[in-house]
Curated annotation (Swiss-Prot):
<protein>
    <recommendedName>
        <fullName>Linolenate hydroperoxide lyase, chloroplastic</fullName>
        <ecNumber>4.2.99.-</ecNumber>
    </recommendedName>
</protein>
<dbReference type="GO" id="GO:0004497">
    <property type="term" value="F:monooxygenase activity"/>
</dbReference>
<keyword id="KW-0934">Plastid</keyword>
<feature type="binding site" description="axial binding residue">
    <location>
        <position position="454"/>
    </location>
    <ligand>
        <name>heme</name>
    </ligand>
</feature>
<dbReference type="GO" id="GO:0009507">
    <property type="term" value="C:chloroplast"/>
</dbReference>
<dbReference type="InterPro" id="IPR002403">
    <property type="entry name" value="Cyt_P450_E_grp-IV"/>
</dbReference>
<keyword id="KW-0150">Chloroplast</keyword>
<keyword id="KW-0349">Heme</keyword>
<dbReference type="InterPro" id="IPR001128">
    <property type="entry name" value="Cyt_P450"/>
</dbReference>
<comment type="similarity">
    <text>Belongs to the cytochrome P450 family.</text>
</comment>
<comment type="function">
    <text>Catalyzes the conversion of (9Z,11E,15Z)-(13S)-hydroperoxyoctadeca-9,11,15-trienoate to (9Z)-12-oxo-dodec-9-enoate and cis-3-hexenal. Possesses low activity toward (9Z,11E)-(13S)-13-hydroperoxyoctadeca-9,11-dienoate. Required for the synthesis of the green leaf volatiles (GLVs) hexanal and trans-2-hexenal.</text>
</comment>
<dbReference type="GO" id="GO:0005506">
    <property type="term" value="F:iron ion binding"/>
</dbReference>
<dbReference type="GO" id="GO:0020037">
    <property type="term" value="F:heme binding"/>
</dbReference>
<dbReference type="GO" id="GO:0016705">
    <property type="term" value="F:oxidoreductase activity, acting on paired donors, with incorporation or reduction of molecular oxygen"/>
</dbReference>
<dbReference type="GO" id="GO:0016829">
    <property type="term" value="F:lyase activity"/>
</dbReference>
<keyword id="KW-0809">Transit peptide</keyword>
<dbReference type="Pfam" id="PF00067">
    <property type="entry name" value="p450"/>
</dbReference>
Amino acid sequence: MLLRTMAATSPRPPPSTSLTSQQPPSPPSQLPLRTMPGSYGWPLVGPLSDRLDYFWFQGPDKFFRTRAEKYKSTVFRTNIPPTFPFFGNVNPNIVAVLDVKSFSHLFDMDLVDKRDVLIGDFRPSLGFYGGVCVGVNLDTTEPKHAKIKGFAMETLKRSSKVWLQELRSNLNIFWGTIESEISKNGAASYIFPLQRCIFSFLCASLAGVDASVSPDIAENGWKTINTWLALQVIPTAKLGVVPQPLEEILLHTWPYPSLLIAGNYKKLYNFIDENAGDCLRLGQEEFRLTRDEAIQNLLFVLGFNAYGGFSVFLPSLIGRITGDNSGLQERIRTEVRRVCGSGSDLNFKTVNEMELVKSVVYETLRFNPPVPLQFARARKDFQISSHDAVFEVKKGELLCGYQPLVMRDANVFDEPEEFKPDRYVGETGSELLNYLYWSNGPQTGTPSASNKQCAAKDIVTLTASLLVADLFLRYDTITGDSGSIKAVVKAK
């Protein structure tokens, strides 16, 4: 539950003011050059004050929104946690970019370096990955990046043969658990059963291993990943699990050592080492990785990227659908059954024909980005454009985009504060995919060794669409929220 709490949806901000295009940013000469507003404040005092605002007095959403209003700009300088007193090697200074146009610069690899900036200037100990620098921490200019990205993409390609079968098999178990809990208790909390389902599904599809070959891993592997993830991101995340000032004192004051999870992580490592031979040989023989590098990167893709991402995104999607009372369920059900006819007709091809289902998935990713913050470091001096001005960025400065605000850019998205299920339907709706950046790049982009876009960009949206379609082949209606399901009516 800690993982879910850390990624809880931010309050809805008011729309920012900007416009962008998936094409390279407009020539800076077309816009006025402006001195970048904002301040880092006095040494120690400024970063500490911003940290307390971010975590305590304001929260991330209000933190960025009030500064954008104060400076009358969607681009400005400020600080972001973690910082003083026990993060002496972390520079909290950032350039915030809060509109679609300025945010798009984060994906121009000629302008930015993505080395060691997954969660900002703070990097969790390499001990969490057995001392290996995994692919996410590499820039595209580093030779090993192409090998690791290629390994990830080929693993995903090969997994497509069993992806649908394993997904539906594990969903059968998941929904069986939910139905049983509802019949016994009148409602079912589904976060943990869903995480167990996700873990088992990913082990089988990505690593080619049935988690049940190890009863300990089948029972506890997903719990280990929850702890492993939490220890890495706690210093950067507002949790709300304990009252302030205890959260600041106990949770945001220091980095957590990998030793706290080393024993259980080693069990996961050994599980992959002993059972995922085909996948590991792919990494060793085709991409020239050592066996240790292949294991550590496979675990990162499985645990951090896939499991962590789905654990945040899918509850948002399920909660959005189960909590809707506008007639959306009836519309989705009608589309799914019209396209599929029967459950046996559900596949990648048929789900791609479900425009409304896909649009709901995309709109959930816009409304609740699973990764709220994205970072990149200026590779050189350059000019960054917002909707109404140009600013000078110096080499080495850290750019930070806060997606819950970026994805509510009123100059790009009509009525950005509203969840519109049909937003991406039709030709006009498809154009908006150019500005959907949840995957570290646009939804219309192509992941490759030359960029940092999520290798699973397309399979994530397909998987979510398959889950929704599967749901409405099973049930006529379903009632609940982002944490529990209260009732289901089976399909007639």
